[in-house]
């Protein structure tokens, strides 16, 4: 899952070497939290107009997680 998120984000940004993902352990609600970090200049590319790109990334990640019976949340920082 982490590799998928890095691959998606790296394809969107100008500085793919600065894309990192931190993963939190499962919280009390059974949710795994992924923290996506990109360069400040690339933040707009990852979020997109009105958050459309961010929503699409979260949708793909949730669909993949559902196939594995997991609950996830993606935070972009």
Model region roles, listed by residue range:
Residues 1-45, 49, 55-77:
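RNA-contacting regions in translation and RNA-metabolism proteins
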């Amino acid at each position: 899952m982490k590799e998928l998120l890095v691959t998606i984000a790296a394809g969107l940004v100008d500085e793919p070497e600065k894309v990192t993902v931190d993963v939190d352990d499962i919280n009390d609600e059974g949710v795994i939290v992924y923290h996506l970090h990109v360069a400040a200049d690339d933040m707009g590319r990852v979020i997109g107009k009105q958050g459309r790109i961010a929503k699409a990334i979260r949708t793909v990640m949730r669909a993949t997680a559902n196939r594995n019976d997991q609950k996830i949340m993606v935070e972009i920082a």
